[in-house]
From Swiss-Prot:
Basic and acidic residues bias spans: 190-201
Keyword Hydrolase included in the entry's annotation: yes
Gene name in the database record: cheD1
Catalytic reaction list: L-glutaminyl-[protein] + H2O = L-glutamyl-[protein] + NH4(+)
Protein name from the UniProt record: Probable chemoreceptor glutamine deamidase CheD 1
Biological processes annotated in GO: chemotaxis
Protein function: Probably deamidates glutamine residues to glutamate on methyl-accepting chemotaxis receptors (MCPs), playing an important role in chemotaxis.
Length: 234
């Protein structure tokens, strides 16, 4: 692929009673419609961005390639590709009327489903990148569910900024096989793409809570909630 493609798998989501889009790895989608964006993550990460004033939002789904370089080095190919994946999402939201200074982020994924395939855990690598990138861009992370050993199913409402997550079985062979193939593909040349780089989380199956000051993470199909992990404000 020569660029980060827009997700095209549109469907009607019977659970949320609205139109939805399923994102595959290395895809993104932005909209101001009252719809749901859904993806399944293993070691990949997804950033969900929302402008609460313009009521527009979007999601991406990506994995950093392992180029053998120091993963924290800004000049490495993997960092350039990660920056590209984030900038595509940010720029599309800005073109649609969003303002960078108003963006809020919710981030997911980075599980250890491909441990041992690279010199460091690829899930940790992805999670560390998305945190650092958003900190450098001064985009506030209002909630996150990163790392661990469980694949995740994530649903995001771009119109409201509401997000929900469901932990999947640790041994989810379809997720592991898909991401193993993605990791092998990511190990190949990413030059063309790299050159172009320059408030609440709930679980599926629960009633939507009223707005609260502290973002919450809730799981699909349960009523249990837990505080979201939040970054310290500067």
């Amino acid at each position: 692929m020569s660029g980060l493609p827009i997700a095209t798998n549109l469907y009607f989501d019977a659970h949320f009673h609205r139109r939805g889009v399923k994102l595959l790895p290395n895809e993104f989608y932005t909209t101001r419609e009252d719809m749901v964006l859904v993806t399944v993550l293993g070691s990949c990460v997804a950033a969900c961005l929302h402008d609460p004033i313009a009521r527009i939002g979007g999601m991406n789904h990506f994995m950093l390639p392992d180029d053998g370089a120091d993963p924290s080095a800004a000049a490495s190919e993997s960092m350039r590709y990660g920056a590209y994946a984030m900038e595509v999402l940010i720029n599309e939201l800005i073109k649609a009327g969003g303002r960078r200074e108003r963006f809020e982020a919710k981030v997911f994924g980075g599980a250890a489903v491909l441990a041992g395939m690279t010199t460091i855990n690829i899930g940790d690598r992805n999670a560390d990148f998305v945190r650092r990138y958003l900190a450098l861009e001064r985009i506030r992370i209002t909630a996150e569910d990163l790392q661990g050993v469980h694949p995740r199913k994530v649903a995001f409402m771009p119109h409201t900024g509401q997000a929900m997550v469901k932990k999947l079985r640790v041994q989810a062979p379809d997720v592991a096989e898909r991401e193993a193939a993605l990791a092998r593909e990511a190990a190949g040349p990413r030059g063309e793409r790299a050159a172009r780089a320059r408030p609440r989380v709930e679980l599926f199956g629960t009633p939507a809570p009223k707005a609260q000051a502290t973002p919450r993470i809730e799981l699909f199909g349960t009523r249990a909630t837990q505080p979201a992990t939040r970054k310290q404000e500067a």
